[in-house]
Amino acid sequence: HLTYGIKMEQLPQMRKDIAAAKAKFPEMEILLGVEANTMRVAPYLDVAPVQLPQFDILLAGYHYGITHAGMAANYLYRHTGLFHSENSSLLVKNTAMILDCLYANEEAGNHIDILTHPGDKGPFDIEDIVKACADTGTLVEINDKHRHLTVDEIRVAAKYDVQFVIGSDAHVPEKVGSFE
């Protein structure tokens, strides 16, 4: 990502830090994870498939600042009202991007554990997405810092055999678990 992320050379130190934290807090399960960005081209994530086994948990979500993800159109949709149509090609492309990401990675053995803030930053068909999450056993994030999932979208999602996780969207350790 252009502004966030980890450097792969930091992983050995992160593993050491996690081992130390596990020794100090044996009652807690502490995982090393990554929130990969979804893209419209295979492998549909911006983290290389060969790097994924280095993580204990894989999250995926759509974000601005990623190539091959419709950034300009989605930004204009969210901030100007352009492309606002129930059947817009942007909605179709965005939804296909998420479905392709979920199914292709599941088929490749790269299970996505959590889909983060679905519906945020562009038009997405939440019903189709939660069906795919149910099919793949992917948890759906309810995010404290983003506009989506909305209450209405949660009601739609709750009709399916999908599980939720609540995220604080912390980008620094001090914000972990902070909810409003």
Located regions from the model:
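Extended substrate/RNA-proximal surfaces in nucleic-acid metabolism proteins
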Residues: L2-D135
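Conserved beta-strand edge residues that scaffold enzyme active sites
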Residues: N37, K121, H146-R147, H171
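Short gly/pro/ser/thr-enriched loop/turn and capping motifs at secondary-structure boundaries
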Residues: I66-T67, R147-H148, H171-K175
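His/Asp/Glu-enriched short active-site or ligand-binding loop at hydrolase and phosphoryl-transfer sites
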Residues: G137-R147, G167-S168
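Short, motif-level signal for alpha-helix interfacial/capping segments enriched in acidic residues
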Residues: I142-D161
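Short acidic/histidine-rich active-site segments
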Residues: V162-G177
